[in-house]
Amino acid sequence: MEISQVLKFEGDPDLLVWKHPVEDFNTTTQLVVDATHKALLVVNGNACDLFGEGRHTLETPNIPLVKRLINLPTGGQTPFPCKVFFISDIHQMDMTWGIPGEIVLDDPTYQILLHIGLCGNLNFKISDHRKFLLKMVGFRDQFDSDTLVAKFRGIIKQYV
């Protein structure tokens, strides 16, 4: 039985958000965050702490030596689920977007129908990592730039 674990980013570097697969970790677990990410600790469904670069000791309700005893009433599963999400902190550049099909507009000056397509490039950097995870991503296992562009595609088309 492990008393302590080390959690670090092991996902695809192109992901905007990656959830570490280990969810049943102890209060002595070490979290290592590299310079290109922030890490958000979620305990019992609550976004608790946002960690920056460095090594951090996580404090969770899971106590290593009595873990088996505590997990007995729940069939071996922890009653205190804990998750760690790694959120990219790098500037995302040249993300292409476009809307499927065309938009038909009536030109009032020349009385003709215009068939217009929309596309472009998107550059951004996540400034509020907690809000990005909670409001845009949710608690998905991973979230990439293609998924983000797909979410914005509908919003862009709605306002054009």
Which stretches of residues belong to each language-model region?
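N-terminal hydrophobic membrane-entry segments
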Residues: 1-160
